[in-house]
C-alpha cells in the first residue's frame, strides 16, 4: 500500500469489500506506471499522497467526484487553507468525494509526458480525466499558464468549446475568479466568493447530470443548470462585448440565467470550523505549521487592495472556537507553531 487506496488485485478488492469497504474494482490507478518514475525526480514525496489528515481513501462510485487542483507545486499548494476546507467538506458528503492534485515540477512533468502518464490525484493516483469536475484555485494571475498546462496534462481539451460530454467540467475559484475573462475560453465555470455553501448546490446539479448518464449533447444542459446557481459564472451562457479590446458589457443568453452574478458569502464563521483535520505534509512545504482562520474580510477598506474589497463583510470567529481549534489541531498534528490567519490581524 503506497497511496491512499490499496492498488492490487481483484482478490484484494473483494477482501476490502468483505470488511465493509467500498473501494470499486472499476477505479483506475496510475500507480504501477507512476512508481517507476519517482526515482528519477527530485522530490518523490510530492506525488505519493498518504499525508496525515488525508481523507479521500474511500472511493464512492456513485458520488460526484471533484479533483481539487492547486496550479503550483505541492510545497506551495498543500498548505492552502481554502483547498483543505473544500476537501474536507466534500468528503463529509454522502453524494460527493474530493481528491487533490498539484502541478508537477518540471522534472516530473517531463517524465510524465515521456511515459504518457496524465495528471493524477495524489490521494489515489486516479487520472484527472476520470473525475466529474477539475476545480482550480486561482490564487494569483501568475498561475494561469500552469492552469492551461494542467488541463493539457490531464488529457482534456484546453479550450472549453472543444470539450465533449465525456470530458470533466473545468472550474475555478479564488480571488482571481473575480476577473474571469482572461480564462473564459478555457474554464467552464467560475465561482465568486466563499465556496463552503456553493459546492453543495453544484454537487447536486452535477449529480443529476451523472444520474442521467451524461447523454450526448447534455454538457450544455449541466452548464445551464450551474449558471442558475447564485455565485457561479458560466462563460458559455453569456455574450461578452468588447470595444477595441476593452470590456464594454455582458448579456445572459437565457432568461433564467442571472444577469448579474452575486458573490457567495457565508454569514457566520462559527458555523464552519474547518479544516478540522489539517493535512500534515510528507516533505517540507511553505507555511509548515498549524493554520487557524480567525476572521475573513478587512475593516480597513484600502482602495488599492483587491482582497480587502472582495472579501467583505468582516466576519470574526469566536475566541472560544479559535482556542478549541488550536488545542485540537496541535494535539492531532504534532505541530508546535500556530499561524492565526486573516487579512489584517
Give, region by region, the residue ranges found by the protein language model:
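Structured alpha-helical segments in the cores of large, soluble enzyme domains
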Residues: 54, 125, 170-173, 177-180, ...
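N-terminal [4Fe-4S]-dependent radical SAM core
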Residues: 38-67, 74-75, 241-291
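Radical SAM [4Fe-4S] cluster-binding motif and immediate context
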Residues: 267-345
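Low-complexity, highly charged intrinsically disordered N-terminal segments
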Residues: 66-71, 75-89, 95-104, 109-112, ...
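Glycine-rich beta-alpha loop elements in corrinoid/cobalamin-binding modules
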Residues: 103-252
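Conserved structural-core and active-site-/substrate-pathway-adjacent residues in large, well-folded domains
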Residues: 90, 134, 138, 147, ...
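Helix-enriched interaction subdomains in cytosolic or periplasmic regions
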Residues: 15-43, 93
